[in-house]
Amino acid sequence: MHPYVKYRYSMRIKKWIASALALFISMSVFGGCNLGKDELQILNTEMYSKEVRDYLLAADDYEQIMALQSADIYDKQTTGISWEKQENVDKYTVVLSVNADMSDELQYVVDGAETEYTFNALMPNTKYYVKLQSYDNSGKMLRETKVQSFKTQSDFSQRIVNVDGVSNVRDIGGYNAQGNSTVKYGLLYRGARLNAITDDGLATFTQELGIKTELDVRYGTDGGKVVDIDGVAYQQLGMWAYSSILPDTCQPKATGAGLFDARTIDGIKGVFETLAEPENLPVYIHCTAGADRTGTICYLINGVLGVEYEGLVQDFELTSFSEQGRRWRSSVKNWEFQSEGVMQNDEKNFIAFGQMHSLMMQWYAPNGETLQKAIENYLINVCGISMETIESVRENLLV
């Protein structure tokens, strides 16, 4: 069967299953009745767009390639609620909790003219409880809906986050790691620069995500601190991307020697030393696009935590669904990812995630060691990071 036909057939089946599940959830919540003023409609518990879900649920390279080729700006959560318009309402408060008694609630204020709200930072595979309060312009509560529950998608663990004015934001948690461990949610976020962050974005950044440290992995020549955020410490720890983090002796002749910049190892070391201290967490790490340098440091972090290559690739390639453009592990030919591991190498950009990984394994796991061990060897022997620091990072970020 031709790869494209195979892809469409597989996706059609998955779409039918997802639609049937969504219908079942809808009927379970509402019993097939029209909404009343005390009821909410739950919107899209699958969390993300069809295009992102097609990629995350792809069964093989063919399906991944087809999903990546259809990628556009879909890096947003889409789960939300809607309600019937009410008279004399100045504002609504959406109240959300993971507890049935609504303890430890989060509140979101919505203008009285609105009839929908999309959540920003839900967790996958999590049951939530929600209600809506309406207020007049004197602050008097007019109505409160009953508490309703919903559960987010459970077929994947990746967590994309909406931060208004910032693109390509996601949690690096949720991935399985070696030793029956999982990377914790809510401690390390990656994304693009904060130049255009809005007040709503800042509220998500500080109140919902609770960011304590902003790590900027750009050098001062192409970036720097652009916004003062109360309670958030800023560190600039510049580095380069992909194979340029490896010493010249490891470089393939095709890319030429001299790409390695010794300052990079100082930046990488600084990142790990920051993550080793619990008081610095949660951390937001970024470059300009949140793609290349950020993708490289996240490869090192999740890799040394014990995430397998397939998970590292997914985290990297999800950038393709943001406004930052395509980021694939390699070029593609005849519906296959190419072994040289270079997607782009021209005057516009150098994108070589697969090449970086191959060289890492070649030089730092020469006797067939695991990817986790290869990155550990690199961090210790090239970057001068102590084993104590690495173990502290693991203790902080794994569960």
Which residue stretches match the model-derived regions?
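Cys-dependent protein tyrosine phosphatase-like superfamily
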Residues: 33-284, 297-399
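Ser/Thr-glycine-rich phosphate-binding loops at phosphate-binding pockets of nucleotides
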Residues: 289, 293-294
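Gram-positive cell-envelope targeting signals
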Residues: 1-39
